[in-house]
UniProtKB/Swiss-Prot annotation:
Bias kind Polar residues: ranges: 1-10
This protein's record includes keyword Hydrolase: no
Other observations noted: The nicking site of REP proteins is sequence, but not plasmid, specific.
Biased composition range(s): Basic and acidic residues: 11-20
Region span, Disordered: 1-21
Protein origin, superkingdom: Bacteria
Keywords: DNA replication, Plasmid
Summary of the function given for this chain in its UniProt record: This protein is probably a specific topoisomerase involved in initiating replication. This protein is specifically required and may be rate-limiting for replication of the plasmid in vivo.
Gene Ontology terms describing biological process: DNA replication
Organism of this sequence: Staphylococcus aureus
UniProt similarity note: Belongs to the plasmid replication initiation factor family.
Species classification: Bacteria, Bacillati, Bacillota, Bacilli, Bacillales
Protein name: Replication initiation protein
Length: 314
């Protein structure tokens, strides 16, 4: 396959900041008396995996190029496979023809976080690596919504059955919440991004709070990235506002003991899910949906860029 000339698209990237997305307003009338304003999230793709096929000729050319380029570290090199990291370890590349033929899947995979790449690095990666692949497409996309608010008290409620795991910090507050299975097509993380940046990269975030809602989409779910959480509600239930002490106690129990949902009759589960939504001053997913809608065209252009439709985002 002939390679695309990327120089014509360089100008589209010059002033691009992948974290600089437009912000949207928000309103919610469920609980006017308890309404709490929250900041508008910043939205980006935080992780991407692109798979495709290398034909024999392209595999040879790419292997020769990678063995000479100083920006690439190669290992596990054989005639039908190799592994590599590129651009200061920010990109992982794997080619394995034998494994692909055995499992009837595409033979090359490229993994990276676009937020960590400069515009020159994006062009380099597309021109020198990804453009060699045929029949390429995404098998993973992570949507990241960053809120400058404390989300430790928020509760994720789904119309579907979701496994829920919560990790608490030394203060007793929740710091990381997982919803779903890591092996599933959709896995949701809500975590204290400010603390994560400090612990993993020793970076101090100036904002008082920075929390991330991250939706990891894999396999066929990547095609629904713009419609991937309609069943989800991220709520801050004001359980103490309920007039009935019995309902207060039950809602508090359900919010803190996930296993208790399984002990309820179907009608009772429906009842308490409805109550939790009604006593919540805000549903973050409403704000996430409006933010996603406002940024959908821009995000689609990013996808198109990696898939050879050179209509880069502004």
């Amino acid at each position: 396959m002939s390679k695309n000339n990327y120089t014509n698209h360089s100008n589209h990237l010059e002033n691009h900041d992948s974290d600089n997305f437009s912000k949207t307003g928000y309103s919610n009338s469920r609980l006017d008396a308890h309404f709490v304003c929250t900041s508008n999230p910043k939205l980006s793709f935080d992780a991407m995996t692109i798979v495709g096929n290398l034909n024999k000729n392209s595999a040879k050319k790419l292997s020769d190029f990678m063995s000479l380029d100083p920006q690439i570290r190669l290992w596990d090199i054989l005639q039908t496979k190799f592994k590599a990291k590129a651009l200061q370890e920010k990109v992982y590349i794997e080619y394995d023809k034998v494994k692909a033929d055995t499992w009837d899947r595409r033979n090359m995979r490229v993994e990276f976080n676009p937020n960590k790449l400069t515009h020159d690095e994006m062009l380099w990666l597309k021109h020198n690596i990804i453009d060699y692949m045929e029949d390429d497409g995404f098998t993973r996309l992570d949507l990241a919504f960053d809120f400058e608010d404390d989300l430790s008290d928020y509760y994720a409620l789904s119309e579907k059955a979701l496994k829920r795991t919560v990790f608490f910090g030394t203060t007793g507050k929740a710091e990381t919440k997982y919803f779903g299975s890591r092996d599933s097509n959709r896995f949701i993380r809500i975590y204290n991004k400010k603390k994560e940046r400090k612990e993993n990269a020793d970076v101090d975030v100036s904002a008082e709070h920075l929390w991330r809602v991250e939706i990891e989409l894999k396999r066929d779910m990547v095609d629904y990235w713009n419609n991937c959480f309609n069943d989800l509600h991220i709520l801050k239930p004001a359980w103490a506002t309920l007039e009935s002490l019995k309902e207060q106690a039950m809602v508090y129990l359900l919010l803190h003991e996930e296993s208790k949902w399984g002990e309820l009759h179907r009608n009772s589960r429906r009842k308490y899910k409805q109550i939790i939504q009604e006593i919540s001053s805000i549903d973050l997913t409403d704000l996430m949906k409006s933010t996603l809608t406002d940024n959908e065209e821009n995000l689609q252009k990013q996808i198109n860029f990696w898939q050879r439709k050179f209509e880069f985002w502004k």
